[in-house]
């Protein structure tokens, strides 16, 4: 492993600290808790939507969340290891066959729905 990769891994460990990042994929509905600073006040704002893209690039990993807010579609890009992210919670798993769901931008209503992935129980091997 080269020196830059080692430094990136150390920085990821330092930034995550005690936070645990859940595994999520495009199509999943997530709630991203974002630290917002307004003047001197600091609060946590929840941003819920569908992950339409995920970019795995080590320390530079990011993902795009799309939500419909009062009839308007809003997309926001988050850096995965950003200190502004307080936490990520997966609400539901989506069953999709694409890595990038950019086609959802041209759809609205029922055609923009994503099928839910049903979780199967693991068989016990004893």
Curated annotation (Swiss-Prot):
GO molecular function: structural constituent of ribosome
Known role: This protein is located at the 30S-50S ribosomal subunit interface and may play a role in the structure and function of the aminoacyl-tRNA binding site.
Family membership noted in the UniProt record: Belongs to the bacterial ribosomal protein bL19 family.
Signal peptide: none
InterPro entries the record matches: Ribosomal_bL19, Ribosomal_bL19_CS, Ribosomal_bL19_sf, Translation_prot_SH3-like_sf
Keyword line: Ribonucleoprotein, Ribosomal protein
Gene Ontology biological-process annotations: translation
Lineage: superkingdom: Bacteria
Gene Ontology CC: one annotated term: cytosolic large ribosomal subunit
Pfam families registered for this protein in UniProt: Ribosomal_L19 (PF01245)
Protein name: Large ribosomal subunit protein bL19
PROSITE patterns: RIBOSOMAL_L19
């Amino acid at each position: 492993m080269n020196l830059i990769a080692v430094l990136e891994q150390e920085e990821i460990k330092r930034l995550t600290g005690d936070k645990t990042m859940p595994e999520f994929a495009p199509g999943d509905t997530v709630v991203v808790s974002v630290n917002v600073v307004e003047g001197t006040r600091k609060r946590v704002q929840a941003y819920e939507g569908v992950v339409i893209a995920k970019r795995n690039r080590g320390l530079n990993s990011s993902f795009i969340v799309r939500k419909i807010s009062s009839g308007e579609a809003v997309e926001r890009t988050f850096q995965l290891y950003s200190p502004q992210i307080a936490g990520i919670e997966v609400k539901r798993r989506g069953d999709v066959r694409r890595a990038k769901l950019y086609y959802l931008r041209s759809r609205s209503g029922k055609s923009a729905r994503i099928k839910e992935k049903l979780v199967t129980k693991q068989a016990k091997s004893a």
